[in-house]
């Protein structure tokens, strides 16, 4: 094994050791034991929310421990693989060792990104809202494509998704949609996706096949917990009920099960129609409303800090990524410069590279 390989392996060991220290592997094992005991409690599922929280946290903790242990095992095996390559004098074995070293660096660096999620709410689950912007029916179709992209990403990671509300456009696509991603660190991970996403393509809705630019906004909020003390007095809330509707305005329910909540002091409106009962829809809508009120509170606090620092801050809704399907194919993040020439894979949920680059960019900016 040459000196460059030795230096690279030593560098990987330093990075992985830092990851293990930040994740507190011994503490992680203790946490798994505690969660396993809680999961074994026969009364756990008397409280559905608590049961889901414990099982989700346990699955995530076990996954993190498994990943970091696998990385350590692979790194320990790497020098042995190079020794076998030297003894065999077989170029294919050397190539195998080199390929494993490159892949191992990618995997360790991806795990390192997880340690950068140290914000106050980063550990939370996420509430994601997608809204179509300028571009008419193309924008509505684009919003639905983005929704599918994020749901496919969550499914690839085995994160449960709960759709609260989908407002369908008349011709195609959606006006807006709100859904939750139930996974620890979902908020910290997806928060870098917030902003305006731009699509350039030949419009499938234009009979002259002209190129169309469409926009959609992505909003990512942390799920509210009881410790956030987001209390909503009954007098501040207006509750309206109506029948759920599907694509083209078709009624999908014969009862008034859909719920619209209006927070009177702020004018924030939340709707939910995807659950089967009015009560379930109201509970889901309240969760989204609380998340939006928490975000409003955070924005006010950030504005105060920016005023003290003389910093204008970054505004929500700024264009952050461009997806070009025609005349060439490219997806490029305008903040990080990270780009991929395979839009089909990205729109099918392969966005980890963009997320990792976004988290690193955010940490450098905040430093």
From Swiss-Prot:
Keywords: Cytoplasm, Methylation, Protein biosynthesis. InterPro entries: PCRF, Pep_chain_release_fac_I, Pep_chain_release_fac_I_sf, PrfB. SUPFAM superfamilies: Release factor. GO terms for molecular function: translation release factor activity, codon specific. GO terms for cellular component: cytoplasm. It is found in: Cytoplasm. The keyword Cytoplasm applies. Methylated by PrmC. Methylation increases the termination efficiency of RF2. Peptide chain release factor 2 directs the termination of translation in response to the peptide chain termination codons UGA and UAA. This is Peptide chain release factor 2. It comes from Mycobacteroides abscessus (strain ATCC 19977 / DSM 44196 / CCUG 20993 / CIP 104536 / JCM 13569 / NCTC 13031 / TMC 1543 / L948) (Mycobacterium abscessus). The gene is prfB.
